[in-house]
Amino acid sequence: MNSTLFSRVENYSVHYNVSENSPFLAFENDDCHLPLAVIFTLALAYGAVIILGVSGNLALIIIILKQKEMRNVTNILIVNLSFSDLLVAVMCLPFTFVYTLMDHWVFGETMCKLNPFVQCVSITVSIFSLVLIAVERHQLIINPRGWRPNNRHAYIGITVIWVLAVASSLPFVIYQILTDEPFQNVSLAAFKDKYVCFDKFPSDSHRLSYTTLLLVLQYFGPLCFIFICYFKIYIRLKRRNNMMDKIRDSKYRSSETKRINVMLLSIVVAFAVCWLPLTIFNTVFDWNHQIIATCNHNLLFLLCHLTAMISTCVNPIFYGFLNKNFQRDLQFFFNFCDFRSRDDDYETIAMSTMHTDVSKTSLKQASPVAFKKISMNDNEKI
């Protein structure tokens, strides 16, 4: 999924018609020029995503780390997710935007290799953090009396994720090159000592095998797994809610269950929607790049890439800012006030501390008062 974050210029045979005073490449056809209004709009959009992604994830990390009572399994995973999203916002957005517009690399050979490597690592860490959160919620809702992950398990899982992410991203370090090959036949002085950065695998089959592996590893595989977990959680919560409705008055029906279900569905939908355009673009480009018109390549890529990067802003909202505690602490964060420990009035944003040790038998035997207490305790802790 991360395979074409940079344009593979070696696949294009283009003729340049450029001004010596312009740092931007233009194709021979004037229709290939991106209007300044489009460039300006894209720059504003990328800037907004960078600001929101950095500030949102940074605030989320600081708030969780500041509060000892919030250091449960899910929040540990959320910090890991936010950190990886923070890396994407810093290492992915600005470099990719500038390079795509300029069509030549100005950040040096080290960054040429490091940038796609860090991007691939960050994306892999992000998706597998979502997988671990789905696993934890699945265990605590579907099998509350069974194995429960603790903080130690969370740290082990995070370590495994980072090792897997680094290992799966190493080909970018090995095969990413910095070369002036596309500019060797350009006589204009403006393009002297200009370089491009792209991946050059031993063969097309090697490249397609690797990019297909990333497609499964970073998108389809995790997404299917997450969907299954949350679907089972949704069914269990709905069934539990229906069982409680049979013996309690309708006025006790909690809206929190609906909020949880909507949040769970939104998590999956947001990830799938944000990454789907770039996934399709990368897949088409990898297998038959000629389908994409040369003039439309950069614009299509930037739009797809920008949509994917919006996920770095969405995750803090779903996992943090919809929670009342984060909203309160966020005010302290932006007002530069000290955080106060509130053991009594804190709610836990995740399902990791839910007291759900209730079987069908106990539900059937419980009284209406007990049902109200059980259901409200569960929902208030989410």
Swiss-Prot record:
Subcellular location per the Swiss-Prot or TrEMBL entry: Cell membrane
Glycoprotein recorded as keyword: yes
Disulfide bonds: 112-197
Regions of this protein lying in the Extracellular compartment: 1-33, 97-115, 175-210, 281-298
Keyword hit for Cell membrane: yes
One GO MF term attached to the UniProt entry: neuropeptide binding
Lipidation sites (S-palmitoyl cysteine): 337
Cytoplasmic topological segments: 55-75, 137-153, 232-259, 320-382
Pfam families, A to Z: 7tm_1 (PF00001)
This protein's UniProt keywords: Cell membrane, Disulfide bond, G-protein coupled receptor, Glycoprotein, Lipoprotein, Membrane, Palmitate, Phosphoprotein, Receptor, Transducer, Transmembrane, Transmembrane helix
GO terms (BP aspect): feeding behavior; glucose metabolic process; locomotory behavior; negative regulation of cytosolic calcium ion concentration; negative regulation of hormone secretion; outflow tract morphogenesis; peristalsis; positive regulation of cholesterol biosynthetic process
One cellular component term from this protein's GO annotations in UniProt: presynaptic membrane
Glycan attachment positions: 2, 11, 17
TM ranges: 34-54, 76-96, 116-136, 154-174, 211-231, 260-280, 299-319
UniProt superkingdom: Eukaryota
Membrane topology: Multi-pass membrane protein
Tissues in which the UniProt entry reports expression: Brain.
Residues the record lists as Phosphoserine modifications: 367, 375
Role: Receptor for neuropeptide Y and peptide YY.
Recorded family membership: Belongs to the G-protein coupled receptor 1 family.
Protein name: Neuropeptide Y receptor type 1
Native species: Rattus norvegicus
